[in-house]
């Protein structure tokens, strides 16, 4: 027992030793006290800091326990793997090198550093301030591994989450003024206030709320079904993702920031063009850029959508998007069962979901359009990283232009009543077997291959390729390219 007014310097506690501190203990090494397991009230060994007691520069090793009761205080404790600190008083400058810190009701932990495999549990009625979290996310993004990093059931203030760090805010917990850097993340089941994502991620789960989050470059806020975000600001190269059933209100989307959502979510806020809304299956005034994406689902609609460089508008069959503005680098994903109308770099374009007729499409940068059976695409331009797919019974009209890096995929017999200009790749595909879905494929003799025919009035080669299949089994059947009434020119 170290009595009040006494000071003990150095020493080791082993083999069920017990030190009761009312005075001051400096430089102790503790390797006993956890005989009944971590954070177990049955433990009686180790170092106990009582009301008015102080411990400085303590080392807690495997199996060791430092217990800080109400009114006690410790500083500069280092806890290795297998050791723990049970805190009902105050602890400053604790380092968890694989060890654990359990902050109980009334306890306050200040400037705890949680290194690899370390764990801090902040319980209801407890507080942790200025914590640095360097572990917890090694299992991958949003993995619910709650045995490393920081778990918050009480209050955590001014936490810094670095690469590989994770803070899990439980349903009854609150995290305030957290900064998350690249490679770290915050999982929110309770309340997160004023989080800054400097390349890090924030996941807001069902029942969780996040207010005042700032998403900076490479940061990502994900609102899951039943989650709520309020007053999120998305700066350049930041991303806000709102899943179906999630809600984000009072969003400020700055230029260069990305919004990823669908018409099954609720998102309300402002962007560089004014106010926008996504609610009740309708989207209005959404701006998509820099990795942003809006999915318009079947039976839902969108109006006045702007798709800029890096943005994607995806319209499902039975969905409708009107007054769309597509600029250079924007991507449209749809099929002939969707209804879309607007303008792109070539002028007006449209898709009539009832007739299956499309006109003036520009597909680039990941954009794609599928012409279903009975549908037709007229005057289509497929740019770099764009794809035009035609099902059996789909057709082309007017001028179909494939630029370098573009693809046209034929899943059946297709007729073009106009011109095809090819600087990209034309693929004859086979939906019935994976064996034949190969560029420049030679079909195996026993493979169930269905060969296709492309018929066009004119074909102009501009250095593109046409990938056709042939069966080498004596029949020599193959895909076919038929020039009907016109000519083939150029180089393919």
Question: Where are these predicted regions, by residue range?
Answer:
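Phosphate/pyrophosphate-recognition segments in soluble nucleotide-handling domains
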Residues: 136, 260-277, 345, 350
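Intrinsically disordered, low-complexity Ser/Thr- and acidic-rich flexible linkers and loops
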Residues: 35-43, 138-147, 436-443
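Short, hydrophobic/aromatic-rich segments at coil-to-beta transitions
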Residues: 16-18, 44, 81, 145-149, ...
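Short, composition-biased local secondary-structure segments
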Residues: 222, 276-281, 295, 350, ...
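Intrinsic-disorder/low-complexity loop/linker signature
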Residues: 18, 27, 40, 144-146, ...
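Fold-core signature of tandem repeat domains
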Residues: 2, 8-13, 19-21, 25-30, ...
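Extracellular beta-solenoid/beta-roll
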Residues: 10, 95, 268-271, 304, ...
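Short, solvent-exposed coil/turn segments at beta-strand boundaries
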Residues: 15, 34, 81-83, 115, ...
